Amino acid sequence: QVLLVLTERKTRYEIVSKIKSKSQYCVVKELDKIERKMGAKKFRETFKTITCDNGCENLDFEGIERSAVVKRKRTKVFYAHPYSAWERGSNENANKLIRRFIPKGSDIGKFSHERIKMIEHWINNYPRRLFNGLSSDLLIKRMYVA
């Protein structure tokens, strides 16, 4: 099992999901699930673009872009250049925060869904210097109220 981590660009809000395998099918299936939970419009507004690394699990760009709910694209996919992690800097920082709880190379299967959601909650409520001590959770709530 592996983690799928989505980072919202403006607020750095994280969605962390455990998926069965590092496969194109599992990535698209989880994005479909997230889109259904959020609603097509909110997903499209939140994740206008998704920048992926070049892992084989991210190669189904049509599946990633295609909405599971409406007959239009849900997002636009871009790929970072090989060995250019800085092109996905916010996501890499989120991965660093996740590693406080789950060291790199750990068996993700040993972590419950509840534990993964607790980590997600901790990250989203962590005060950020970038936001003058405000959390991503607070900022995304403000964004959707406005």
Predicted feature residues:
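Acidic/histidine-rich, metal-coordinating catalytic segments
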Residues: 31, 41-60, 82-83
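Short, surface-exposed connector motifs at secondary-structure boundaries
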Residues: 11-15, 41-48, 101-102
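Short acidic/glycine-rich loop or secondary-structure boundary segments that cap or lie
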Residues: 1, 14, 25-26, 58-61
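Charged alpha-helix within mobile-element recombinases
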Residues: 55, 72-77, 81-146
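Short, well-ordered secondary-structure micro-motifs
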Residues: 60-63, 90
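Short, surface-exposed basic-aromatic patches at helix termini and helix-loop junctions that form
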Residues: 62-75
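Short conserved beta-strand segments at catalytic cores or DNA/RNA-binding microdomains
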Residues: 1-15, 20, 31
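Active-site beta-loop-alpha junctions of metal-dependent nucleic acid enzymes
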Residues: 16-41
